Amino acid sequence: MTKTAVVLLSGGLDSATVAAIAKREGYRVIALSFNYGQRHDRELRAAADIVQALGIPEHFSINLDLAQWGGSSLTDRQQTLPQTGVEPDIIPSTYVPGRNTVFIALGLSLAEAKGAEAVFLGINAIDYSGYPDCRPEYLATYQQLAALSSKVGVEGRPIQLLAPLIELSKVDIVHKALELGVPIAQTWSCYAGGEEPCGRCDSCRLRDQALIEAGHPELASAKGRLWREKVD
């Protein structure tokens, strides 16, 4: 019997890698993306490209205007995106209040409606340690809620929340993506709006550094490479 899983697919490197992992593990993948008012909505085109590249049969996209109330530099264009790198124990301004909690709830809804056994998430606690909704304890607590709040959970068949990258470094994720044939060049991680990665935002810096350390500087952003050359 074919297993089915919902994958929360942003269009970034992490979620694309998770989609490839789900496919390798034998799941029929249903992708779920969100247009939530993020300034980097370019990632939605990347999500569609990844769906095609990986041969994912179903892709849903939901509109959620979280930009209405702001609270994050990802949804409020009046705020400046951080460019100083991730700092331990500091929650960055790119944290979107309640975003993962809402996304996972909708992923669980889709999974239950489609008879899926799991929801795969691309959250990571190593490089994004400042995000409270990317921690293992957050995921474990949400798993309990998933079991209590759904028909299948009450019947003893709770939908599993799976985050295979949660304790991997960004370099390890790059290696995993390469191993699985993820089209890294088609993924999008930049937080800034535009058609080319800015190379300066925290997400670009983490991604580019990981690609360079993994031995693939050619996959790093062009602007990021130029900026690093000037700094060095």
From Swiss-Prot:
One of its GO terms (biological process) is queuosine biosynthetic process. Its EC number is 6.3.4.20. Keywords: ATP-binding, Ligase, Metal-binding, Nucleotide-binding, Queuosine biosynthesis, Zinc. Zn(2+) binds at C190, C198, C201, C204. GO terms for molecular function: ATP binding; ligase activity, forming carbon-nitrogen bonds; zinc ion binding. The keyword Ribonucleoprotein does not apply. Its cofactor is Zn(2+). Transmembrane segments: none annotated. It comes from the Bacteria. ATP binds at L9, S10, G11, G12, L13, D14, S15, A16, T17, V18, A19. Binds 1 zinc ion per subunit. CDD domains: QueC-like. It catalyses: 7-carboxy-7-deazaguanine + NH4(+) + ATP = 7-cyano-7-deazaguanine + ADP + phosphate + H2O + H(+). Pathway: Purine metabolism; 7-cyano-7-deazaguanine biosynthesis. NCBIfam families: 7-cyano-7-deazaguanine synthase QueC (TIGR00364). Catalyzes the ATP-dependent conversion of 7-carboxy-7-deazaguanine (CDG) to 7-cyano-7-deazaguanine (preQ(0)). Belongs to the QueC family. This is 7-cyano-7-deazaguanine synthase. It comes from Synechocystis sp. (strain ATCC 27184 / PCC 6803 / Kazusa).
